[in-house]
């Protein structure tokens, strides 16, 4: 099973402030929606609760709480290991989509990074881990917006 990771990061490494993303760069969310369309997303409970279930996506939500969902496109797992074991049986590609603890736990296991770097330095309390040295950028596109940002694809190897 291929694991990808998608994240929006500020210039100072912030990815969140509590349950919120501390910016709104017009157009950047469209990248997320396009890349994750019809895909399985692996997320933590807090991230899932803050983003909600977007249409045309399936979710593997990792939580230690008693969180439940009636949505047929949401599976709930007590650990990342359980989620990955079960996802391998039903899909060949998963996009790791946050939050901070999920990224930290899986960044060394993913094959591809989809990173939007937002040209802002907000306050926040959730940070993205350091990109491992065995990843290399293979694509970059800059976007002018209300807050400028660049989108990069990084590959392992």
Curated annotation (Swiss-Prot):
Q: Which PANTHER family match?
A: DIHYDROFOLATE REDUCTASE
Q: Name one GO biological process term.
A: one-carbon metabolic process
Q: What Pfam families is this protein classified in?
A: DHFR_1
Pathway membership of this protein? Answer: Cofactor biosynthesis; tetrahydrofolate biosynthesis; 5,6,7,8-tetrahydrofolate from 7,8-dihydrofolate: step 1/1
Q: How does it assemble?
A: Homodimer.
The record lists the catalysed reaction(s) as: (6S)-5,6,7,8-tetrahydrofolate + NADP(+) = 7,8-dihydrofolate + NADPH + H(+)
Where is each DHFR domain found?
Answer: 2-156
* Protein's job: Key enzyme in folate metabolism. Catalyzes an essential reaction for de novo glycine and purine synthesis, and for DNA precursor synthesis.
Named from the GO MF annotations, one term is:
NADP binding
* EC numbers: 1.5.1.3
What the entry lists under CDD domains is as follows: DHFR
Similarity-based family: Belongs to the dihydrofolate reductase family.
Q: Which UniProt keywords apply?
A: Antibiotic resistance, Methotrexate resistance, NADP, One-carbon metabolism, Oxidoreductase, Plasmid, Transposable element, Trimethoprim resistance
Protein name, per record: Dihydrofolate reductase type 1
């Amino acid at each position: 099973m291929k694991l990808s990771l998608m994240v929006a990061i500020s210039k100072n490494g912030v990815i969140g402030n509590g349950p919120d993303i501390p910016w709104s760069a017009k157009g950047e969310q469209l990248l997320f929606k396009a890349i994750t369309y019809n895909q399985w997303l692996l997320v933590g409970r807090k991230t899932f609760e803050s983003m909600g279930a977007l249409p045309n996506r399936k979710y593997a939500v990792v939580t230690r709480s008693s969180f439940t969902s009636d949505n047929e496109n949401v599976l709930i797992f007590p650990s990342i290991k359980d989620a990955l074991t079960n996802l391998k049986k039903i899909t060949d590609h998963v996009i790791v989509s946050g939050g901070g603890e999920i990224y930290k736990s899986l960044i060394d296991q993913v094959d591809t990074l989809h990173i939007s770097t937002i040209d802002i330095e907000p306050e926040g309390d959730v940070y993205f881990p350091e990109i491992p040295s065995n990843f290399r950028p293979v694509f970059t596109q800059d976007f002018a917006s209300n807050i400028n940002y660049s989108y990069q694809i990084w590959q392992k190897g």
